[in-house]
Design a protein with these regions (language model features):
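A residue-level marker of the well-folded mature domains of exported/periplasmic proteins
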Residues: 31-364
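Bacterial N-terminal signal peptides
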Residues: 13-27
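Initiator methionine at the very start of the polypeptide chain
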Residues: 1-2, 31
């Protein structure tokens, strides 16, 4: 090789190295300059809904060093939520996670005022050009927990303390009962709706009322599972947690298992979309196969053969070879809701206004 060619090759290598440094540095500058604001309806240490979102953005921060977080907890819905979001934007936030169902309308209003800011809302049913909605489909996980509960119960009476009789929660209770009956045809699930997402006094009263009826496994669909699982523990009953992996420590002896949201990878994806300019408004629905949701570790009361049984069914769900709501299915009034051979799709859960045969209680 001639001296001229050697010098030329070195020059090209230097240019490529310099370009690589610029590109890497450019990505680092973007990460360093990104501010993400997240507002929570409750405490970030509630062992449930809010803690799951808080853990999600912390995982995002670990995945993307340099991203700055602005977190505010215990933000009421309505005007207060709007004010907090606007304050975050004034502090430089270009990403807002409005982490409560009731924040949707406030987020839409603020999004209209700040079109260059990207908003993300869990469970929303409306979007905007700069607002994405997302959620994790939970019936498969509830079915699996129903299987574990159906194998664990001594009385064949299971119970659920539920915030409100909305379709997605009814679907979860139905899935739980179907899972329980798949391994224990005598299992029944009694449900109490308390009318709110967080009220420890009402949660304890509902839990005790169910336990007084002979229920020996309690599940919960409210923001924080702590009160219900602790009430079960105090009365030597079993429990199934929801929302966060951190719930088990509050009732270790009676713990069967739980369902936990794992938002870290999704929040990392959102931040990267904003950083690289690929954001687009969309509605995202994932589940066990998408790593938005996981099963918490099983408790000591669950035998190895039950863990294996549940794990095998989980693999079927993830492979798409099994469906939760496969007919024939009747509601608890005896009306056929899903014909034999048909499947009620998970994408239509918003239309589920009934409780399946075996559930004691009414949605209205």
């Amino acid at each position: 090789m001639s001296l001229t060619l050697t010098r030329a090759a070195r020059t090209v290598r230097c240019v490529l190295v310099a370009l690589t440094v610029v590109l890497v540095a450019g990505g680092a500058v973007q990460a360093q300059g990104l501010k993400v604001g997240i507002l929570h309806i409750g405490s970030m240490a509630d062992g449930g809904y809010n803690q799951a979102h808080a853990e999600g953005v912390q995982a995002m921060k670990r995945n993307l060093p340099g991203v700055e977080l602005i977190e505010v907890e215990n933000v009421p819905e309505g005007a207060d939520a709007e004010r907090v979001m606007e304050n975050m934007i004034k502090q430089g936030a270009t990403v807002i996670v409005a982490a409560s169902f009731g924040y949707l309308e406030p987020a839409l209003r603020v999004a209209a005022k700040y079109p260059d800011v990207k908003f993300f809302h869990p469970g929303g049913y409306k979007r905007a050009p700069n607002l994405t909605t997302y959620w994790a489909s939970t019936p498969e996980a509830f079915y699996l927990m129903g299987m574990a509960a159906g194998k664990t119960t001594r009385t064949n009476k299971l119970g659920y303390v539920v915030a409100l009789p909305i379709s997605f929660f009814l679907a979860n209770v139905n899935a739980f009962e179907l899972g329980a009956r798949s391994v224990n045809p005598k299992a029944e699930t009694r449900v109490v709706f308390i009318g709110t997402f967080l009220d420890p006094a009402k949660e304890a009263a509902a839990a005790n009322a169910l336990l007084d009826q002979g229920v020996d496994v309690l599940g919960v669909i409210v923001d924080s599972p702590i009160t219900v699982v602790q009430t079960a523990e105090k009365r030597n009953a079993y429990s199934v947690g929801y929302h966060s992996l951190g719930a088990q420590k509050f009732a270790p002896k009676g713990w069967i298992g739980g369902i936990a949201f794992t938002w870290g990878n999704l929040y990392t994806r959102f931040a990267r979309q904003v950083m690289d300019g690929t954001f687009k408004s969309e509605n995202i629905l994932g589940g066990l196969a998408d790593d938005y949701l996981t099963l918490a570790p099983f408790g000591p009361s669950v035998p190895a053969d039950v863990v294996a049984l549940v794990s095998a069914k989980k693999q079927e769900f993830m492979a798409g070879t099994s469906q939760v709501f496969t007919g024939p299915l009747k509601d608890n009034r005896g009306v056929e809701r899903v014909k034999a051979g048909a499947v009620f799709p998970l994408t239509d859960l918003g239309k589920m206004d009934w409780l399946v045969e075996g559930v004691i209680g009414q949605p209205r």
